[in-house]
């Protein structure tokens, strides 16, 4: 690995946009792999370093390149609500069908975490609301099972339903979303699912 490439990896993770630019100008490998197989763009995304990510994306970094645990800049930004970076990845060819190590699209962890603006962005971009991950769950299942039933999760469920999520898809154990919500006492979510 060249010095410029080492500098690029460090600068991206630190969010030092000027150092990123210098390293790229010095011929650094924009797709080099650092710790954990992270590209400079994945490293910048994981640290939510917007300016560094912007420079890398504009210089042609692959928004779909995955690290050793199957995170890409697109998937990670979606999963963590790094919406500015997410929008950039979507504008630069993010693969909406790409999946993480759990076989889920970016919409599933965004829903699990109650990240309403991120859920809206992903649905608007065309991510399939009914994709089923390796656990047998859709975004709707995750919002119910791993959420806390609070108002933000009610909004996520409403947004998923308005975005076309199918409330009749059963989880891997054959349980409907409405039954999952009822079992947890999430009355407001039950009401959304029954509307």
Residue ranges and their predicted role:
Residues 16-24, 49-57, 82-90, 115-123, ...:
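Ankyrin repeat structural motif
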Residues 167-195:
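Leucine-rich solenoid repeat scaffolds
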Residues 1-26, 35-38, 58, 195:
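Intrinsically disordered, low-complexity regulatory segments in ankyrin-centric signaling systems
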Residues 10-15, 43-49, 76-82, 109-115, ...:
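Ankyrin repeat A-helix N-terminal signature
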